[in-house]
Regions:
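Hydrophobic transmembrane alpha-helices
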Residues: 1-63
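Short helix-perturbing small/polar motifs within transmembrane alpha-helices
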Residues: 3-23, 85-134
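Interfacial aromatic-anchored transmembrane helix boundaries in multi-pass membrane proteins
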Residues: 21-40, 68-103
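Alpha-helical transmembrane segments and their helix-entry boundary regions
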Residues: 62-66, 121
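Membrane-embedded alpha-helical segments of transport systems
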Residues: 71-76, 129-135
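Conserved small/polar residues in nucleotide/adenosyl-binding loops
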Residues: 137-139
Length: 139
């Protein structure tokens, strides 16, 4: 049974995922285009958000929030970066989203919540991203 604190953690995680999936990434490159200084990259802030949420909260909370996010995007609302529906299941982007499940488990295994410092956060984040990309190669 979920208590109120776990429910709040899940809702905060879900809210963070939905908001960051809609935020585009811009890189200022003033020497390429004279008219506009920003170039939009076709990525979102989902992976850094998943990493940060997994480092802060427990694995179960982030897995539940991410599962709700997937269900919302496939069946209810277009919360993914490029929309969403049942047809999104057949796109490569959905496979990339499914690759975030091992990322959550790997980060939680690497994370030691007794001592928290920036160096461990960065090291565990980069190790988890590398492991996620290696797991996507073998899927």
């Amino acid at each position: 049974m979920l208590n109120l604190y776990k429910l709040i953690e899940i809702l905060v995680s879900l809210q963070s995922l939905v908001i960051t999936s809609m935020l585009p990434v811009y890189i200022p490159l003033p020497f390429i285009y004279k008219s506009s200084n920003n170039i939009e990259l076709p990525i979102t802030w989902q992976i850094p958000t998943i990493i940060l949420l997994t480092l802060i909260f427990h694995k179960k909370v982030v897995l539940r929030a991410f599962s709700i996010y997937i269900i919302l995007g496939v069946f209810i609302f277009p919360v993914f970066h490029q929309g969403g529906s049942i047809g999104y299941l057949l796109t490569p982007n959905f496979g990339y989203l499914l690759g975030l499940y091992p990322l959550i488990k790997i980060i939680d295994n690497l994370n030691n919540r007794n001592k928290i410092n920036i160096g461990k956060f960065l090291k565990n984040g980069f190790l988890a991203i590398g492991a996620m990309h290696l797991s996507l190669i073998h899927i």
